[in-house]
Amino acid sequence: ALSIATDTWISEIFASAIAGEKKADDMVILAVGGYGRRELAPHSDLDILLVHKSVKNVSDIASKIWYPIWDAGVKLGHAVRTPKETIQLCGTDLDTATALVTARVIAGNQSLGTEIINGAAESWRKRGREWLVELHQRILDRYVKDGEVAFLLEPNLKEGLGGLRDIHALQWAVMAGLDLSADDRRQLELCNEVLLGARVALHRHTARASEILRLEDQGPVAVLSRYASDDALMAAIAEVGRKVAWIADEAWAQLDPPADRSPIPQLVAPGVQLIDGEIHIAEDIDIAEDPTLLLRVATAAARAGVRIDRSSLDRLGDASPVWPDPWPAGASDDLVALLLEGQAAIPVLEALDQRNLLVRVLPEWAPVRSKPQRNAFHRYTVDRHLWQTVANAAELVHRVLRPDLLVIGALFHDIGKGYPGDHTEVGVEMFATIGPRMGLSDADTAVVISLIEHHLLLADTATRRDLSDDATITMVTNKLGSTLVLDLLHALTQADSLATGPSAWSEWKAE
C-alpha cells in the first residue's frame, strides 16, 4: 500500500516537473532497490533513477523532482543517467546491477523504461554468474559484522545473516542461474513476509529507519505485528532467520563444490553413500522401515564434513517414521555417535530440523525449537544453545569416563525451558521418561538426571560461595554423590557456559 501511494505521489511530481517540456517523452522515472521491489517501509530510503535521452535541461527537471521529495522529509537515493550510461554501469557496478534487476517504471516513457529494465536484466544474465562470488563474499562479511538474525537478542532484520538482504541476494542469484527449488522459493516468500512485516512495524514504532530490533522495541513491534507476545514475535523471527540462512547456505554451496568429489558411490554406512561430495541414501532403502537411518546419514555427513544431498534429505522428510517407545536397539548409540562429532554435527542437525526430523526422534524437542532466551547472557535460542553445548562438550570428552553421558546430558540439560515451570525441575521430570525410552539403564538415567538437576550448581557455587571453605566442598560432594557425576558436571558446566555467551565463562570461574 505504501509503495502504491508513493507511486502516485512521484507520478504527480514528475508530471508537474515536465509540464511544457518539448522532450518530455524522452524521460522515464524508475523505482529501484527496495522501492522497485515494492518493499517500502515507512522510513525507508526512496531510490529513484531518472533516465533520459540527451535532454539538455535534465538537471533542472531533476531538481524539480528531487526538491519536493526532500521538502517532504523523505530520504532520497537518486541518480540521472542516459540509457547507455545505465546499461554500462550495470556491467561494472554490482550495486547498480542488483538495484536494476527489480526496477519498474513509475512515470514517463514506458517503452524507454522497459528497454532499460530489459537491458539491465540481460546484462545481469550475462555477467551475473561472475557477480555471484562477490555477492556471496558480501554476505559472509555481513555475517561477521551483523551476526545471525535467528540467534541474536537484538537482530538486524535487514543485514543480519538470514535477514532480508539474504532473501534479496538469493532472488538476484536465481536470475543469474543459481538453482533454487520451487519449494525453497515459496519458503523465502513466506519468510520475507515475516521479516518485512516486522521491519515495517519497527519503523512505525520508532518513527525512524531502524533495522535492529532492540529489546525495548520488541513488545510494541509484536503488538503492531499482531503477535500474541514479544516471545512469539522473536520465535517467529528466529524460525524464519534459520530457514533463510539454511536455504542460502545450501544455494551458495553450488559456487564451491567439494574439490575431491567423485561420482563413484562410496558406502560409508549401511544404506548410506558418499557421491559427488554429498551424503546420499541408497535408492533401494525403505526409509519407513529403517527409523535410525536418519542418524546414520547425519553422522556420516558430520564425520565427512559434507552436506546431505537435498533429494535424500527430502526422502527422509517424506518417509522417516516417528520413533517408537522404546527406541530401536542401538539407536541411542547412533545418537551419541552423531553428538560426539561436535561442531561438525551442528549444520547437519540444522538440516534434519529443517525437515522436522528431530521431533520424530524426540517429540519433546518441538517446544524448544527457535525458542528465544531474551536476556543479555544468552546468545542463542534454546535449541541452538543445546547443540552448541553438545559441541563444546564433545571437545572435553577426554576428561571424563563416560563421554556418552556427557553429550546426552549436554543435549538435555535445558530441555525443560520449552515448558512452564522451573526448567530444571521440569527437565528432571522429563528425562525420567526420556532416558528409559532411549534404552538407557536405570543407573545411566540417574546420572543424566543428576546432571540436569545440578547443571547450574558449580557455576553458582563459584560465584556465590567461599571456595576455600570446607563446608562448600562438602555441600557439593554430598549433592552429587560420586566422582563420576562431579567430573561430568565439571565438563558440562564449562560447555554450557561457553555456549551461553562470552560473559558466562572465564579463567576465574574455571579455577
Predicted regions, residues:
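Divalent metal-coordination and catalytic microenvironments
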Residues: 6, 352, 389, 452, ...
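Alpha-helical phosphate/pyrophosphate-handling elements in metalloenzyme active cores
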Residues: 8-22, 26-30, 170-183, 377-408, ...
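Generic alpha-helical structural context detector
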Residues: 299, 350, 391, 450-453, ...
